[in-house]
């Protein structure tokens, strides 16, 4: 089961920042998940519509100029990065899942991914584009078929994983709170992977692996990776009642 660092290693670092991304790579995460939005014609790596939760700014991200955004600091004294800065930081060292927060950011994002493949050492199969906007994913796959697409859902759809297959996705990304065995089985029957968000508890990590989930998104990737490592056999030899070691 693969481990994706959710917004980078965001449990111990400011989310969606270069330091969180670099830390996730140091932890040997299989991939990193980030969120992108458009502001002042720049693809910014940021989750919320509003600035105040994670930065010292106020107002909406989309209303700020690029210069204003550059002056802001996150709670960990980091800048809000652009997508190109994130791609340049990773340079193909792991997979990257880019979640599109709205339709307008899609074209500039895919153009940036093209640049990453041409100039920054990524292979197309390392790049995943995900969104709750399923029609948008279908349109993007028509124009950029070389990338992987994943349909996000917070509930169990009536048609289970059929929606993802219908729009040409290679995976379903599902909320851990509503994960369903029938959805996992249906997705696998259709040749789709199932990745689950957001998984921070060790017990959940182990249980999801047993359920056959293909990947998880975690704010604490090092914790999840450690939980998935095979337990090393004890170096002590077994001792029988006779006192003879075998």
Cite the ranges covered by each PLM segment.
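Phosphate-group recognition and catalysis centered on beta-loop-alpha active-site segments
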Residues: 1-246
């Amino acid at each position: 089961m693969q481990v994706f660092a959710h917004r980078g290693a965001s449990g111990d670092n400011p989310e969606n920042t270069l330091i969180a991304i670099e830390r996730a790579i140091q932890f040997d995460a299989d991939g990193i998940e980030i969120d992108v939005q458009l502001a002042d014609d720049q693809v910014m790596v940021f989750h919320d519509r509003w600035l105040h939760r994670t930065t010292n700014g106020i107002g909406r991200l989309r209303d700020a100029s690029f210069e204003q955004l550059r002056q802001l600091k996150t709670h960990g004294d980091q800048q809000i990065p652009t997508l190109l800065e994130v791609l340049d930081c990773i340079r193909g060292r792991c997979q990257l899942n880019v979640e599109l927060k709205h339709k307008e950011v899609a074209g500039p994002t895919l153009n940036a991914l093209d640049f990453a493949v041409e100039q920054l050492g990524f292979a197309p199969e390392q790049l995943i584009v995900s969104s709750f906007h399923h029609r948008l994913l279908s349109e993007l796959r028509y124009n950029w078929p070389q990338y992987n697409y994943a349909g996000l859902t917070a509930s169990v759809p009536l048609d289970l994983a059929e929606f993802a297959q219908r729009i040409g996705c290679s995976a379903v990304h599902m909320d851990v709170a509503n994960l369903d065995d029938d959805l996992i089985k249906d997705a696998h029957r259709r040749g789709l992977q199932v990745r689950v968000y957001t998984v921070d508890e060790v017990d959940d990590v182990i249980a999801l692996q047993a359920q056959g989930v293909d990947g998880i998104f975690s704010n604490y990737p090092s914790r999840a990776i450690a939980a998935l490592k095979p337990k090393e056999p004890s170096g002590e030899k077994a001792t029988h009642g006779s006192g003879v070691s075998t």
